[in-house]
A protein has these predicted regions:
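Conserved anion-binding
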Residues: 59, 66-116, 151-154
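Catalytic cores of alpha/beta
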Residues: 18-24, 66-73, 129-140, 148-154
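Generic structural signal for well-ordered alpha-helices
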Residues: 16-19, 44-51, 68-72, 87-90, ...
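Glycine-rich, proline-tolerant flexible connector loops at the mouths of alpha/beta enzymes
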Residues: 18-46, 65, 81-93, 118-133
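C-terminal alpha-helical cap/extension of soluble enzyme domains
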Residues: 138-183
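Conserved, mostly hydrophobic/aromatic
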Residues: 15, 22, 50, 100, ...
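Short, well-ordered coil/turn segments that N-cap beta-strands
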Residues: 5-9, 26-28, 54-59, 78-80, ...
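N-terminal amphipathic alpha-helix/helix-capping segment at the start of soluble metabolic enzymes
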Residues: 1-12, 16
Length: 183
């Protein structure tokens, strides 16, 4: 998508129904996050559920146990990519033939992650300067959530944050007597 100059739309979700709605809406990447202190076994269940609800989108899953065996288990559960931090972890998992969504905290980490086999990068809290540096340093897409912006190749956002904004707009429209999209 980076080569096509098309921004990547990513959303974090944990269940089949939400994944189906996101997939039908044209979301490019659905990521199963480990926020909420989910255990590894719970992530396997969430990953399988998201895979069942997804036809077109790429599915990634956070890897709290950065081992090749754990990465294989997530791939077997339906993850197209596993999301992990640390260049050594990315290197080992990519060398095992499992596509990696690398998580970084500074622009200096972007190129080493690409060099060891990352397919995609999640750069949280990037800001315009550091984010632009990371994007320029690599040929793979660099996404971001909080602190990200148009300088990145795409964005990640948790579904509940998107849903909250959409529901607030819906409530405002109904209360103001405005037409509601989809009527």
């Amino acid at each position: 998508m980076k080569r096509e100059w098309r921004k990547i739309v990513g959303v974090v979700a944990w269940d089949e129904g939400t994944a189906r709605a996101l997939d039908e809406a044209g979301v490019d990447l659905i990521s199963v996050g480990d926020s909420g202190a989910a255990s590894f076994d719970e992530l396997l269940v969430f990953c399988a559920a998201v895979r069942r609800g997804t036809v077109h989108a790429v599915v990634s899953c956070d890897l709290p146990e950065p081992t090749v065996d754990a990465a294989r288990r997530l791939a077997d559960a339906g993850a197209d990519l596993v999301k992990v931090e640390g260049v050594e972890n990315v290197c080992a998992i990519a060398a095992a033939g499992i596509p990696v969504f690398a998580q970084i905290a500074s622009s200096a980490e972007a190129k080493p992650m690409e060099d060891v086999g990352a397919a995609l990068i999640d750069f949280r809290h990037s800001g315009p300067e550091a984010g632009s540096e990371a994007v320029a340093a690599v040929s793979i897409p660099v996404l971001g959530g909080l602190g990200g912006g148009p300088w990145l190749d795409g964005r990640m956002r948790a579904v509940y944050k998107l849903l909250g904004g959409a529901l607030a707009a819906y409530a405002d429209d109904v209360r103001a007597g405005r037409p509601v999209k989809g009527d």
